[in-house]
Amino acid sequence: MSMSDPIADLLTRIRNAQMVAKPTVSVPSSKVKIAISQVLKDEGYIDGFQVKTEDGKTELVITLKYYAGRPVIERIERVSRPGLRVYKASASIPQVQNGLGVAIVTTPKGVMTDRKARATGVGGEVLCYVA
């Protein structure tokens, strides 16, 4: 079965796994999902991730992070979706919770946080908000 929005599927799997306090979550792998996972790791929202290949299928295994028994990610939501793409210039990329959260943006220079996109002066598609 084909998936219409694989990024939304990744975010939903992370959200659902954290609600039941799972230590890891597995999703089908892609370059964009790996880049999003790298941003989440760099920002301290997940402990890490691994790419595993089994029977010709690559799978991304994300190790979730908890603090005092509660998930570090309080809110993770998709912004740009297949039916309504959201593009922003570098100056108009929104701040999430007055800078406490991050917006993950895909730009011509790769997937990065809203702060890095503003600092480098590039805009792009706003994939999701994480807080």
Swiss-Prot record:
Transmembrane segments: none
Gene3D superfamilies per record: 3.30.1370.30, 3.30.1490.10
InterPro entries for the chain: Ribosomal_uS8, Ribosomal_uS8_CS, Ribosomal_uS8_sf
Keywords assigned: Ribonucleoprotein, Ribosomal protein, RNA-binding, rRNA-binding
Protein's GO biological process: translation
Ribonucleoprotein is among the record's keywords: yes
GO molecular function terms noted in the UniProt entry: rRNA binding; structural constituent of ribosome
Gene Ontology cellular-component terms listed: ribonucleoprotein complex; ribosome
Family: Belongs to the universal ribosomal protein uS8 family.
Function in brief: One of the primary rRNA binding proteins, it binds directly to 16S rRNA central domain where it helps coordinate assembly of the platform of the 30S subunit.
Complex and partners: Part of the 30S ribosomal subunit. Contacts proteins S5 and S12.
Full protein name: Small ribosomal subunit protein uS8
Record lineage: Bacteria, Pseudomonadati, Pseudomonadota, Betaproteobacteria, Burkholderiales
